[in-house]
């Protein structure tokens, strides 16, 4: 679960977020560009630190904790797949910062790759992949971290509608299987509404609407 009440002194627009998200809830985060959607996710993940207030994740205070210490995994629009590495190596970075995996870690990589539909690509270099395949690799790496809170910041916006729908269905299945708490920034809410059970709308650094679906 997520519970926060924080301020963030952004240069052009001071922000104040108050939000509670139950365990396993799937929340869409919508709003105009620059409204503060990504900042909200960055505060939860620890990439931005709150000016004041508190962030509780699964009832533990992580307000000023390091990114790596938080029970959160996050995927951005830019997939950050390393082109010179294989798919297996890219996914394995979720487990170890080096390129040598133990047999047990290799099995974990194969399992998540199978769930993402990219098992046959494990030995292929990332620079030989399509955009949709790269995003599947990035999503697999994110999910392999096995954190209870999943944050997605417009991860599929660069893909065509068919590829977006495929990956959104994968996210829905994984979230249900693992009972993950999901916050996802999206500009294609009408296409992805079935993925969520709640939507929040952000304007000028504040949540101005909150609706169950």
From Swiss-Prot:
Belongs to the ABC transporter superfamily. Thiamine importer (TC 3.A.1.19.1) family. The keyword Cell membrane applies. Its EC number is 7.6.2.15. GO terms for molecular function: ABC-type thiamine transporter activity; ATP binding; ATP hydrolysis activity. SMART domains: AAA (SM00382). This is Thiamine import ATP-binding protein ThiQ. ATP binds at residues 31-38. Its main location: membrane. GO terms for cellular component: plasma membrane. The keyword Transport applies.
